Amino acid sequence: MRRRDFLTATALAGTVLPLQRAVAATTTAGNGRKFVFVVNYGGWDPTRVFAPEFDNPNVDMERDAEPAAVGGLEFVDHAERPAVRSFMETWASRSLVLKGVLVPSVAHENCLRLCMTGTTRQDASDWGAIAAGVVGADFALPHVVAAGPSYPGEFGAFVTRTGTSGQLPALLDGSILDWSDVAVTAPSSRAETIMDRYLASRLRAWNNQVAGGRDTILGQAHATAHDRALTLKGLREIVNWSGSSGFGEQVDFAIDALALGVSRCVTLSFSHNGWDTHVYNDLYQSQNFEVLFQGLARLVDLLATTPGTEGGTLADETVVVVLSEMGRTPQLNSGQGKDHWPYTSMLVVGEGVTGGRVVGGYDNYYYGRPVDLASGEVDDGTGAAVSSDVVGATLLRLAGVDSETYLPGVATLDG
């Protein structure tokens, strides 16, 4: 059976709110929102897609680019980036752009941690890990990282990497035994089934006889781990667990993991020619954005056509967060590149957000403009910065998590 047919056969089956609220006040049934994080490490240039600063004399824009808009979503149009226009024309109504997001550093690793956890604390958990650990613990792999960064913090038990060398599929099919320096013979399929059944019966017996306390906790944890292992082994011929090399393979893996109910959160990574464009900024940024939006279009198309786990499609259940840990300076340097800048932009697509809208902006110095967090409108007088921790707190709220527990005192973007 083809993977696509299997997903359809086994499936268990965005309204815009008044006042143009950027984030929905309610969640899907049972806090069931799923998340896909697409991390673009290196620092993209928002002025090549998200920030049409053509009227700003302090910003170097491409001479052959033009401002464009689909509904209320403004973007930078360029003949060499047709995938960007195509994506906006198709999905603008479900897309929200956050402009001028403050990430208070210009060092890659610090910015990446700030962008994904809201803090530079080494023990902090990223948004996907928190969402998976707090309200997604029943999934076999609550947060799976196909590629890119991960900050599990206290939720390490809920985060899994597929591995850059096929470690996860090797674990599932038993071929990891071949990696051992000591010869090990794997049991036959029949013997493995007998052992699985025996272990399950022993776990049931143990959990039925223990009186509570530490033994009960350990027994239940062991039983849960065993159930998850059986679930994953049952899918080892269906899912391409090693799909972490190219972005297209990562997208396929994400769709499988979400549609089959394996994961609540998936992290992907896109690089192509690399985003850290200290030289030849326009050449590499343009190529990167074109290929990125080709991949994003495929991701969102698949979400919209793949049955979800709660009825409808995955698009009705999933939020896609596309980010880069920093922006680039407003002006080109002597090498026709751009250097690090602490203001970036983000793209959020899918369930729970008001699409066709831009929140935030840039001032004449290309600093992020403050926003009234209650309305989402720019407020240069009394507004607050749209900082990475505010974005994170808002995403946690979308996930059904009390953000105050993990980002105390940080406001959310309600408008």
Label the predicted regions.
Residues 3-415:
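Ligand-binding pockets and gating/stacking loops
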